[in-house]
Amino acid sequence: MLEHLSIQCADVAASAAFYDWVLVPLGGVRVLDIGSVIGYGVPPNPDFWLGPCTTGEGFRESHIAFAAPDRLAVRAFFDIAVASGAERLHAPRVWPEYHANNFGAFARDPDGNNVEAVCHAPE
């Protein structure tokens, strides 16, 4: 039920380089660049935003889950993330504790956030 999500990045360019690639298998692309803020989504609607850090309170990890159309897209997301140097958190697999078709993979983005691609469709 999210309309949009925005995260603050220590290095917007590094985060943009990461998300430019990992969102492709999920159908997401860079939609808008407005100064130092970048919006991603399925055109024409940006629903995931990157911007520079505006608070000096230190890092707080976010968990961001992106919907994947199928399990192949989850695997591609993970492979691209790891190839870009992201820390592997959890390789693609079924997470039966949520439900029988919850297939997800997790990696850490350049700012340390836990990013996930998840598909709920059966194999």
Per-segment meaning from a language model:
Residues 1-16, 64, 121-123:
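N-terminal beta-strand motif that seeds the catalytic metal site of vicinal oxygen chelate
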Residues 10-13, 66-111:
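Vicinal oxygen chelate
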Residues 1, 57-60, 99:
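Short glycine-enriched loop/turn motifs at secondary-structure junctions
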Residues 5, 99-100, 106, 118-123:
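Short beta->alpha transition motifs characteristic of CBS
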